[in-house]
């Protein structure tokens, strides 16, 4: 419990007092960009990414220690038959990450990214959100605090991902709780739900949001009641990154739901974040639009485990390299426009 009283109090205080961008670093980056050997705007969004890096790190754009952080959790709602896979797959995939056998491992090698995987009490699933809150306030706050430690080893670009059987059900419930609409609008196949399994998934989301309806005006209550440990940990990691001047790339539908909690608590909470990709999960683009973001990639992926964010990190690294490595007109002896 925080020294100030209730477990969430310290997080509410952080969310009220988020640091802003470094305007001097942003101005310096824009000035340098204007001198590089290219027409203004010719690198398109790469230029905006370089400016974003400068603004949120407070220094010239560079990516030297990129990190993919994957948070793994299990969910009591799987007892409702919302997924074709057993919850044991979560732990098995964590072992696969450790052995280097997952897609995210290959992408990290290809783009020279660090990888950390956080096992969040997989033997103790959260409460079934159709019957009770996923977490107590104390447990949710403790998991957020744990997530904040993801960047303790040092990084200058954080990619946020997850693993958790049943967590697209959780993401759909969070989005329905935050934004309204219908369960059908937010529920998708996830790991392959179809037919009766998909119908049970929709019913579970409807039941959960109805059960907790009276508590959904508070985003942190949405998180603890409808979320899960990986949701809380990702929210904590994104928040810690903001406090420590680390830009963030958010992965897919589930990671976007975690980010949405912070955005609902403070409209500026995700200004240091990019959305790495839009997944093929039907509700993801709608969720991204609710955040006022534009994804970097659209590759038809729906794997999770940070893969879309990691691929986007390659683009961010390229943006920084162009900004820092290109010659200026003066250095190259190339004539600038009149």
Swiss-Prot record:
Entry-linked Pfam families: DBI_PRT
Catalysed reaction equations from the record: 5,6-dimethylbenzimidazole + nicotinate beta-D-ribonucleotide = alpha-ribazole 5'-phosphate + nicotinate + H(+)
Annotated active site: 305
Pathway: Nucleoside biosynthesis; alpha-ribazole biosynthesis; alpha-ribazole from 5,6-dimethylbenzimidazole: step 1/2
Listed EC numbers: 2.4.2.21
One GO-annotated biological process of the protein: cobalamin biosynthetic process
Family: Belongs to the CobT family.
HAMAP family reported in the protein's UniProt record: CobT (MF_00230)
Annotated function: Catalyzes the synthesis of alpha-ribazole-5'-phosphate from nicotinate mononucleotide (NAMN) and 5,6-dimethylbenzimidazole (DMB).
Protein name (Swiss-Prot/TrEMBL): Nicotinate-nucleotide--dimethylbenzimidazole phosphoribosyltransferase
Encoding gene (name): cobT
